């Protein structure tokens, strides 16, 4: 029944609501002076029994309670990316999310569980090897440039000529590295001064 004002003071049982969500947060007795209404964020309509994992939310327009799923404070995982999402609002579990955490890197969702995504891992290892190769090629070129200058100017020492040849050989061998075999790559040895 809906609340009605009275000419008499009275004490009634009220059900308190959280401002913003109107979820049930407790009950208590409230003193109602004559010609006044209910305290803010409360109702005199009792909530239904609330099962675990739900909260009762009061709809003021309909003057009725609704049960709403409550997963706040929990973490779910996007089945497309594996990214974690911290639930901070009332409502059902978002679509395309699961409670199951991916068990490490390179996981994909198969509809019921996370499984190793060997293709994604392989692609990552290839990209990683390509970056390593590019970086090593740059280092080799940086070593070769001044040695090549000395050779071009015919002022290279025996040691510089030997190093130039070693770095050029290294760069050629490095260029031949097939990154598609990553992570099983045998990188050529970096030349060292003797």
UniProtKB/Swiss-Prot annotation:
A Pfam cross-reference name: Caudo_TAP
Keyword annotations of the record: Chaperone, Viral release from host cell, Viral tail assembly, Viral tail fiber assembly
Source taxon at top rank: Viruses
InterPro entries xref list: Phage_T4_Gp38_tail_assem, TFA_Chaperone
Coiled coil: none
Annotated GO biological process: virus tail fiber assembly
Role noted for this protein: Chaperone that acts in assembly of the long tail fibers.
Family: Belongs to the tfa family.
SUBUNIT field: Homodimer.
Protein name per Swiss-Prot or TrEMBL: Tail fiber assembly protein
Organism: Escherichia phage lambda (Bacteriophage lambda)
